[in-house]
Amino acid sequence: MDTWTLLLVLHTSLLLPWAEGATPTLRFVAVGDWGGVPNAPFHTAREMANAKQIGKVVQMLGAHFILSLGDNFYFSGVQSVSDKRFQETFEDVFSDRSLQNVPWYVLAGNHDHIGNVSAQIAYSKVSKRWNFPSPFYRLRFRIPRTNVSVAIYMLDTVTLCGNSNDFLSQQPERPRNLELARTQLAWLKRHLADAKEDYVLVAGHYPVWSIAEHGPTHCLVKKLQPLLVKYGVTAYLCGHDHNLQYLQDENGVGYVLSGAGNFMDPSTQHQRSVPNGYLRFHYGAENSLGGFAYLEITPKEMTVTYMEASGKSLFKTRLPKRAKA
C-alpha cells in the first residue's frame, strides 16, 4: 500500500502540458455503471457516447486519472482475466488517443460481484491503464506544483453491505462475509481518523443518498454516513442508480452520484426518502446519451461539473478545502 501511494504521488506531481501556467489543479473523471452488455457488440450507444465525450474532455481540459465507480461489466461481471469483455467493453470502447495513457482506478459494483472480481483485480497486471490493486484501497495525490494533498478511499460496498438483486430487492440485505465487512469498515475508520490531507474523498458503488430507483442504501446511511460527517470528508462518489445526482447534507458533505455511463433511468421514486434540502441536482432524461462527472481540485476548492455525453454542461458546484483541526 505504501509503495502504491508513493507512485501515485510521484505520477501526479509531473507537469502535464495543459497544466502549465494555469492554476495548479488535479483533474479527473468519475463514471459509473458503464459496463456495456453481455451480447454483441458488448457495448451500448450510451457507453460509446460517454467514451467519446470523455476522450474529448481529456483532450481539451486534461485528466490525471479516471475513477470507475462499479458495474464495470453487465450483467454478470467477468469470468477470468482472459475474458473477452475486457477488450470488447473496455479497451475497444475507451480507445481515443487522449485516453491511452490515462490510468483508471477501479472498484466493484453489484453486477461485478455476480462474476469474478478477483479476475478484475488480476487484469491490473495485463492492462497498462487498469488499476484495481485490491477490493478496497487508498489513493493519495498531490495537486501538481503544490503541497496540497488529496486522499481517495475506494470501497467495496458489496462486501460491506451485501449484494442486491436489481430485479427482486432494491436493498442489499447483509454482507456474505461479516468478518470481511468488519475489516473493511475498521480499515476505513482508522484511515479517516488519521487523514491529514486537504481533501478527502470516499468512493463506492452503492449510494448513501439517492432519490432514484434504488434510493438511499440503508446499510451505508447507518455505517458510512456518520463517518463521513465525523471525519470531515469532502465528498462521497458513487453510481448504482442510472442517472446523475448531486446532494449535500447540512454538514457540507457532498454526494456525487454518477451512474449514467451505460443506461439512463428517470426515476425519482425515493425523493421522500432523502432529507429535505439535500437534493441539489438530478438528471435522468430517457432520451439522453448519459453522462459523467468531471472534478477539478485546486488549492482553494473542488469543483464538480456534471457533463452530458452530448457535450453539454448540466450542473456545477464547489466544495471547499477541509478545515484544519
Curated annotation (Swiss-Prot):
GO biological process, one term: bone resorption
Leader sequence segment: 1-21
Catalytic reaction equation(s): a phosphate monoester + H2O = an alcohol + phosphate
Entry's EC annotation: 3.1.3.2
Top class in the EC scheme: hydrolase
InterPro entries, per database record: Acid_PPase (IPR024927), Calcineurin-like_PHP_ApaH (IPR004843), Metallo-depent_PP-like (IPR029052), Metallophosphoesterase_PAP (IPR051558)
Compartments in which it is found: Lysosome
Principal subcellular localization: other
Glycosylation sites: N116, N147
Swiss-Prot/TrEMBL keywords: Disulfide bond, Glycoprotein, Hydrolase, Iron, Lysosome, Signal
Cofactor binding summary note: Binds 2 iron ions.
Membrane-spanning intervals of the chain: none
Highest taxon of the lineage: Eukaryota
GO molecular-function terms, A-Z: acid phosphatase activity; ferric iron binding; ferrous iron binding
Keyword rRNA-binding assigned: no
Cofactor dependence: Fe cation
Quaternary data: Exists either as monomer or, after proteolytic processing, as a dimer of two chains linked by disulfide bond(s).
UniProt-recorded name of the protein: Tartrate-resistant acid phosphatase type 5
